[in-house]
């Protein structure tokens, strides 16, 4: 492979070569564009739109459109796209990932494909990692789009529905992945089509695409309502696990981040909870509480995985070190941690709508992304999203020096060496950016620097604006900045006066991350646009990566050398071993994400069916025909269930059948039982269907056709929503228990697909039964109105299997003693609450 690349160039190099002729065409138009007046340049937008309406494609007008944006950018922003940025723009327009190093101007690159695709009027979404960057980019680049006659919107958390709709109707819309995902889910929970805010998902450019499509891929978005389960069980389980002894009662698998009871632990659980067999299926709920309590107490670490602040447990993002205010771990883990820390335990929530980023972004007509580091995950981008990664050449060569890793025997020796290295650089005024893996490590280094009298800034980012401000100054003379690995992404570090001469920005990594990509991101903060700089990673054998995944060979080498605590070695063997450990973890994480996608694809297909049905109802389509199809299915199922060919007493079977259908759709005393005895099953179905349709026609006369059409939509919508929400939770429970099938040599994903499909069919049957029954029993004086079956209370960015939850939004249900929202005047429990 190496020889072929050397002869023919890498895949990226070959693709870039293909794009260069397009860049030449854009450059040829440069002089023409410069001669145009502002008004003539602006008029190009109208001209392009007309050409598109007359049959030209966006590819046809690409060179000219890019040339227009380039010239407008020079006039409005005083920034002119250089050739490498034009290449990046073409890559994004083609629906690929552009890997562009830090400082190469990705924000400006996005304006090229955004303008070109914005001309179609179908909308372009530009995804950023936080609200601050969304607002900043929309404001800055909005001037350019506005000059050219395109509108710009920005979606941030605090907007009203009206403001969101306006932003989505803009030609180009900026916002975070969470906001776009939640709006999609909410749009599929509305009860009137006018409440929707999003348009069809057309073209998106995802900034920091690796962070969103890979790091957060396992984290579902969840909109939830309040659950009913008591929180007392968490306290009881917490008390129990705190009595257990490590190795004797439980073991910890650090690689899998799991805690398991031993046989002795099982025995203790049986004694404590007075159950005969703890592992029995009937004790699944007890197992759930104990499992989460074990994990909370022995796998989750305070100040690393979460912090306790003002009596509240707050998740710490494992990639950025940021506090994730408002997010909660799902599946009861957050409650278990609250019990462990003895703070108020919030109730578990009930999921009302959910989707993963993997499936949300795959719905776009065209998906593209940009980042400084994507090549190490090229296979995953291609396999999961069908995206190529193209490495765009840098405008100036990278001259940063990446030093070999320094390996220390102990954590203490390593930290002392890091502090000494920072102090040395500070003496000569060289700015230093120190990357840590946790808030805890940041604070340890900070306290040691204080003792040495070295002034510094600590970035445990809570406010993105403040974070961006600190990062902006990190390249100035004498600055020392300590930050968790990815804090401040999206903000450039520009070098201050005189810094180039003393070596540029010095990067110190205090630990290797389990992903090479995160390490590369830290290195990439230095040496932007051909600046000088250097990077070094300080590693100890006590680091998590080395301890859990490092080979015994390295331990042996270090012990043979008899290193002192503060002595370090540079070794190719060690560096290679670290890289192998990282590859192993990356491969493992990819497999997990692929497996989860296998699970989520089942739900995704089901979600598409349900959301399509909802959409048809909301669009005001006449659903009478569908209701009649449901009616026939309900009758047919009832006949097949009650009438068996080999039954001895037909009369008894018919009595049960008619009694059953009387409750649903057949009026009492309307069927001649003896006449049924001479009919085949098909004839019985036809006869009963005719009786039911006649009854329904009477109902229509009673209500008027127009009123009954609206009632049909209301009832179908309510039935679909109620059953779908229950189904989501049932599928979630199925997924929790399905892993045990692996012990029986059954593929869990396959089992989940088969059983999930059967459950979905049952849900569809249940929707049909409930809808038909409600429509045949509806009364003029209490005809149902459109109401939400639940109210949103929380939106969380869900939970990876054993990883932080993302955003959840909770929905309040109607209290059982509240007045029913249907307008009957009865209490909810005596009215629609009975049907629910």
From Swiss-Prot:
Gene encoding it? secA
Q: Where does ATP bind?
A: 85, 103-107, 492
What PROSITE patterns does this protein's entry cite? SECA (PS01312), SECA_MOTOR_DEAD (PS51196)
> What does the UniProt entry say about where the protein is found?
Cell membrane; Cytoplasm
**Which chain positions lie within coiled-coil regions?**
none
One GO CC term on file: cell envelope Sec protein transport complex
- Name of the protein in question: Protein translocase subunit SecA
Kindly list the positions annotated as binding Zn(2+): 820, 822, 831-832
What is an annotated GO biological process for this record, any one? protein import
Spell out the reaction equation it catalyses: ATP + H2O + cellular proteinSide 1 = ADP + phosphate + cellular proteinSide 2
Quaternary arrangement and interactors, per the entry? Answer: Monomer and homodimer. Part of the essential Sec protein translocation apparatus which comprises SecA, SecYEG and auxiliary proteins SecDF. Other proteins may also be involved.
Species: Clostridium botulinum (strain Alaska E43 / Type E3)
Summarize the protein's role.
Answer: Part of the Sec protein translocase complex. Interacts with the SecYEG preprotein conducting channel. Has a central role in coupling the hydrolysis of ATP to the transfer of proteins into and across the cell membrane, serving as an ATP-driven molecular motor driving the stepwise translocation of polypeptide chains across the membrane.
Q: What is its EC number?
A: 7.4.2.8
Gene3D superfamilies linked to this entry: Helical scaffold and wing domains of SecA, P-loop containing nucleotide triphosphate hydrolases, SecA, preprotein cross-linking domain
Enzyme class, one word?
translocase
Gene Ontology MF annotations: ATP binding; metal ion binding; protein-exporting ATPase activity
Task: Tell me which UniProt keywords the record has, alphabetically.
Answer: ATP-binding, Cell membrane, Cytoplasm, Membrane, Metal-binding, Nucleotide-binding, Protein transport, Translocase, Translocation, Transport, Zinc
Kindly state what the record says about how the cofactor is bound.
Answer: May bind 1 zinc ion per subunit.
Source organism's superkingdom? Bacteria
The similarity annotation says: Belongs to the SecA family.
Stated membrane topology is: Peripheral membrane protein
Enumerate the cofactors the protein uses. Answer: Zn(2+)
């Amino acid at each position: 492979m190496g020889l072929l690349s050397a002869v023919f160039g890498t895949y990226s190099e070959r693709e870039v070569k293909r794009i260069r002729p397009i860049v030449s065409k854009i450059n040829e138009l440069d002089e023409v564009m410069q001669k145009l007046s502002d008004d003539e340049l602006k008029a190009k937008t109208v001209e392009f739109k007309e050409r598109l309406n007359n049959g030209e494609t966006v590819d046809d007008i690409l060179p000219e459109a890019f040339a227009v944006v380039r010239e407008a950018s020079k006039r409005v922003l005083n920034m002119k796209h250089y050739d490498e940025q034009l290449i990046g723009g073409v890559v994004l327009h083609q629906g690929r990932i552009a890997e562009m190093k830090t400082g190469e101007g990705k924000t400006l690159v996005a304006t090229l494909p955004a303008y070109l695709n914005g001309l179609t009027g179908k909308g372009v979404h530009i995804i950023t990692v936080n609200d601050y960057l969304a607002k900043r980019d929309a404001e800055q680049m909005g001037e350019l789009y506005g000059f050219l006659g395109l509108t710009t919107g920005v979606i941030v958390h605090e907007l009203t529905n009206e403001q969101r709709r306006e932003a989505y109707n803009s030609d180009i819309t900026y916002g975070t992945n969470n906001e776009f995902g939640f709006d999609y889910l909410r749009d599929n929970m509305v009860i009137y089509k006018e409440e929707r805010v999003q348009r069809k998902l057309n073209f998106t450019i995802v900034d920091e695409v690796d962070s969103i499509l890979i790091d957060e891929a396992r984290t579902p978005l969840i909109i939830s309502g309040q659950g009913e389960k008591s929180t007392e069980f968490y306290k009881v389980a917490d008390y129990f696990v705190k009595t257990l002894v490590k190795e004797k009662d439980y073991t910890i698998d650090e690689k899998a981040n799991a805690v398991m009871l031993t046989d002795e632990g099982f025995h203790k659980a049986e004694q404590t909870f007075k159950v005969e067999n703890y592992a029995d299926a009937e004790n699944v709920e007890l197992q759930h509480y104990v499992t989460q309590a074990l994990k909370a107490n022995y796998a989750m670490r305070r100040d690393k995985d979460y912090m306790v602040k003002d009596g509240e447990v707050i998740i710490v993002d494992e990639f950025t070190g940021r506090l994730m205010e408002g997010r909660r771990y799902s599946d009861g883990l957050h409650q278990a941690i609250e019990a462990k820390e003895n703070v108020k335990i919030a109730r578990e929530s009930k999921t009302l709508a959910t989707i993963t980023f993997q499936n949300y972004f795959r719905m776009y007509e065209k998906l593209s992304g940009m980042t400084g580091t994507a090549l190490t995950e090229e296979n995953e981008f291609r396999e999961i999203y069908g995206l190529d990664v193209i490495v765009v050449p840098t405008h100036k060569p990278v001259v940063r020096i990446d030093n070999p890793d320094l390996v220390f025997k102990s954590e203490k020796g390593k930290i002392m060496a890091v502090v000494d290295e920072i102090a040395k650089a500070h003496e000569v005024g060289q700015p230093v950016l120190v990357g840590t893996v946790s808030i805890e490590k940041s604070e340890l280094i900070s306290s040691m620097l204080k003792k040495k009298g070295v002034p510094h800034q600590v970035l445990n980012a809570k406010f993105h604006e403040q974070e961006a401000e600190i990062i902006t100054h990190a390249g100035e003379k004498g600055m020392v900045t300590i930050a968790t690995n990815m804090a401040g992404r999206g903000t450039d570090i520009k070098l201050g006066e005189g810094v180039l001469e003393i070596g540029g920005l010095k990067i110190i990594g205090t630990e290797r991350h389990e992903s090479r990509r995160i390490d590369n991101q830290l290195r990439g903060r230095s040496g932007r646009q051909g600046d000088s700089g250097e990077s070094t990673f300080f590693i100890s054998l006590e680091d998590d990566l080395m301890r859990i995944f490092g080979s015994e060979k390295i331990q042996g080498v270090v012990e043979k050398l008899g290193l002192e605590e503060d002595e370090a070695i540079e070794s190719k063997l060690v560096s290679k071993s670290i890289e192998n450990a990282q590859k192993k973890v990356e491969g493992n994480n990819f497999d997990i994400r692929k497996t989860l996608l296998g699970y989520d694809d089942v739900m995704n297909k089901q979600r598409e069916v349900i959301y399509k049905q909802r959409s048809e109802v909301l669009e005001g389509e006449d659903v009478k025909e569908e209701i009649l199809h449901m009616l026939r299915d309900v009758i047919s199922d009832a006949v097949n269930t009650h009438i068996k060919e080999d039954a001895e007493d037909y009369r008894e079977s018919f009595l049960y059948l008619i009694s059953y259908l009387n409750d649903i759709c057949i009026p009492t005393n309307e069927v001649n039982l003896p006449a049924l005895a001479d009919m085949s099953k098909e004839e019985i179905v036809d006869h009963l269907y005719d009786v039911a349709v006649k009854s329904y026609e009477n109902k229509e006369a009673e209500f008027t056709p127009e009123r009954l059409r609206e009632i049909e939509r209301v009832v179908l919508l309510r039935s679909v929503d109620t059953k779908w929400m229950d189904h989501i939770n049932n599928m979630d429970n199925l997924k929790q228990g399905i892993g045990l099938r692996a012990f029986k040599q059954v593929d869990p994903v396959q089992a989940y697909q088969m059983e999930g499909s059967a459950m979905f069919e049952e849900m569809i049957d249940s929707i049909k039964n409930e809808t038909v029954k409600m429509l045949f029993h509806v009364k003029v004086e209490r005809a149902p109105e459109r109401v939400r079956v639940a109210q949103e209370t929380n939106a969380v960015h869900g939970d990876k299997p054993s990883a932080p939850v993302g955003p959840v939004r909770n929905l309040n249900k109607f209290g059982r003693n509240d007045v029913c929202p249907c307008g009957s005047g009865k209490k909810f429990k005596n009215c629609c609450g009975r049907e629910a």
